[in-house]
Design a protein with these regions (language model features):
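Histidine-centered, transition-metal-coordinating active-site segments
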Residues: 1-234
Length: 234
């Protein structure tokens, strides 16, 4: 669904130069908001925040399961510690079931964050009296956490950046992934026939190569890289 609202919602960030370029190609289109400094639709604002909530929860679970972070480390983060203690008070038996305790902690954390967004957003919409889409766009950010939840969620995000996203093992894997993409690009530019026929026939070769790689799954990219270079990096 490439309606205006969908495209606008997907475009979270846009430099002034890119916005001006978009405005030239589509006057009054998705670039206009970044030039006028107005807000996206309430649906787009909600999706942005829902994404952040879901990603944090998923990354906590993924990080603990992978061994990159521990529950002991997470207990230094006020938001996680609060719901972990709450879960153990409600279900003392979880003290001996760390995996279930983690799931219950995440469940409670998600529930309260969602409730906080609903309550805070409702109050903001009522306060500014936004009655239609245009008024909502001009009112500033309306979908948000309360100040308290924003601070606690921000602390969690900083923790994840420092201990998970910047973990040496993650950084090493990221570097190898970048190398794979770079080498795939070089091979396809030199040998377009290695791509699917519809991409190889494109008039702008470098753009076609970029689009072809962008459409790959991780697994397919790894297989293609090994096939074309004879090396397995990951």
């Amino acid at each position: 669904n490439l309606s205006f609202e969908t495209r606008e919602g997907v475009l979270k960030h846009c430099s002034k130069a890119n916005a001006e370029h978009l405005e030239k190609s589509e006057p009054g289109g998705v670039g206009r908001r970044f030039l006028a400094r107005t807000q996206p639709s309430l649906e787009a604002q909600l999706c942005n925040l829902a994404d952040a909530i879901a990603y944090n929860a998923h990354d906590i679970d993924d990080g603990v399961r992978s061994g990159l972070i521990t529950v002991a480390q997470l207990l230094e983060v006020e938001l996680f510690a609060h719901y972990h203690q709450q879960a153990l008070r409600s279900h003392p038996a979880l003290a001996n079931k760390p995996r279930r305790a983690l799931y219950e902690t995440i469940r409670r954390m998600l529930s309260d964050q969602v409730y906080d967004v609903i309550l805070t957003t409702s109050e903001r919409v009522k306060k500014v009296g936004a009655c239609n889409v245009d008024e909502a766009r001009l009112a500033g950010p309306l979908v948000a956490f309360s100040d308290d939840m924003k601070a606690r969620s921000g602390e969690l995000k900083k923790f994840l950046f420092a201990h998970l996203y910047r973990h040496p093992q993650v950084m090493e894997t990221t570097g190898l992934a970048q190398q794979i993409v770079h080498e795939l690009f070089e091979v396809y530019v030199r040998q377009p026939a290695e791509m699917s026929a519809d991409f190889a026939a494109g008039t702008d070769l470098r753009r076609s190569v970029a689009d072809y790689i962008a459409g790959m799954t991780d697994r397919f990219a790894l297989r293609e890289h090994e096939r074309l270079t004879g090396r397995r990096l990951l």
